[in-house]
UniProtKB/Swiss-Prot annotation:
Pfam families in UniProt: RRM_1 (PF00076)
Sequence repeat start and end residues: 267-278, 279-290, 291-302, 303-307
Annotated organism of origin: Arabidopsis thaliana
Protein name: Serine/arginine-rich splicing factor RS41
Keywords of the record: mRNA processing, mRNA splicing, Nucleus, Phosphoprotein, Repeat, RNA-binding, Spliceosome
Disrupted-gene phenotype: Mutant seedlings show increased sensitivity to salt stress and abscisic acid (ABA).
Any one GO biological process: mRNA splicing, via spliceosome
Ranges of residues in domain RRM: 2-74, 96-167
Region Disordered, annotated ranges: 73-92, 168-356
One of the record's GO cellular component terms: nuclear dicing body
Tissue expression: Leaves, stem, roots and flowers.
Compartment annotation: Nucleus; Nucleus speckle
Length: 356
């Protein structure tokens, strides 16, 4: 009897679902379920041919997946095959672990498999994974004897399929052994660290993992400067021609300028300002209000008189000072008045001479 390969169905599909699907075309002897595919054994090959023609590329399941149904490429043998023919057809090396499929996954327990395989040798471990199981024997001869006796036998009204596992458990540690996790963990500890971990553990990772190196970098005089040139204010202070005159010290000590001078150039404020700040204030400071009033309004008569007197007294030490109107009157009274003649004084001098 040649099995029919059926694949591409949903992973949650059950053996009873496939059996019900193929039963429409003939009698189904058994279904060997795998992960994602199955082998369907039908009693008559002509019925199997009909099933292949009808079900290949057939949309099946909730998602409408297209089935792949065809003859198996290698003849897996019939129900009356022996263990020797089974091993020769599969080409697997004998091992201590047997691979069991096609049992009732919903109702079969570990104890049921132990009772079925115990008569042929001492069992080390039994593990069930969804719809397949692994039976591990203590000796390889016991596993061979169990395979010859239990393959195509009935377990809880199901015809099971038994074959050798791909690798031997205790020598290979391939995952079929119950010691899988204990075998893998020491290997992981002995394994060399990954390049990512080596990179993170190295002192050159990122900006430096060592706090000492970080402190050494911060205390360096070049830390944080990069390629930026010093601010104009710093260049003026570092210049040998920088002078600390008395007026500058007085302005720095004044409470008005202290708030501006205390701004740190490291915060980016001093770099955009022209050096030094107090010079800009001197140039940009507007004259006092009384000067604006004096410039905007027309000068009074005594200012005109003062301008004339200023041209004569440029050599005087008082030249350039702002004089009050009272001072101007005192000066004019002391040195003689050269302004416009008073009509009272001019009347006797401009009167026509008396006729003799």
């Amino acid at each position: 009897m040649k099995p029919v390969f059926c694949g591409n169905f949903e992973y949650d599909a059950r053996e009873s679902d496939l059996e019900r699907l193929f039963r429409k075309y003939g009698k189904v002897e058994r279904v060997d379920m795998k992960a994602g595919f199955a082998f369907v054994y039908m009693e008559d090959e002509r019925d199997a041919e009909d099933a292949i023609r009808a079900l290949d590329r057939f949309e099946y399941g909730r998602t409408g997946r297209r089935l792949r149904v065809e003859w198996t490429k290698n003849d897996r043998g019939g129900a009356g095959r022996s263990g020797g023919s089974r091993r020769s057809s599969s080409g697997l090396r004998p091992s201590k672990t047997l691979f069991v499929i096609n049992f009732d996954a919903q109702n079969t327990r570990t104890r049921d498999l132990e009772r079925h395989f115990e008569p042929y040798g001492k069992i080390v471990n039994v593990r069930i994974r969804r719809n397949f199981a692994f039976i591990q024997y203590e000796a390889q001869e016991d596993a061979t004897r169990a395979l010859d006796a239990t393959n195509s036998s009935k377990l809880m009204d199901k015809v099971i399929s038994v074959e050798y596992a791909v690798k031997d458990d205790d020598s290979r540690g391939n995952g079929y052994s119950p010691e899988r996790r204990r075998d893998r963990s020491p290997d992981r500890r002995r394994r060399s660290p990954s390049p990512y971990r080596r990179e993170r553990g190295s002192p050159d990772y990122g900006r430096g993992a060592s706090p000492v190196a970080h402190k050494r970098e911060r205390t360096s005089p070049d830390y944080g400067r990069g390629r930026r040139s010093p601010s104009p204010y710093k260049r003026a202070r570092l210049s040998p021609d920088y002078k600390r005159d008395d007026r500058r010290r007085e302005r720095v000590a004044s409470p008005e300028n202290g708030a501006v001078r205390n701004r740190s150039p490291r915060k980016g404020r001093g770099e955009s300002r022209s050096p030094p700040p107090y010079e800009k204030r001197r140039e940009s400071r507007s004259p006092p209000p009384y000067e604006k009033r004096r410039e905007s309004r027309s000068p009074p008569p005594y200012e005109k008189r003062r301008e004339r007197s200023r041209s004569r007294s440029k050599s005087s030490p008082e030249n350039g000072q702002v004089e009050s109107p009272g001072q101007i009157m005192e000066v004019e009274a002391g040195r003689g008045y050269d302004g416009a003649d008073s009509p009272i004084r001019e009347s006797p001098s401009r009167s026509p001479p008396a006729e003799e």
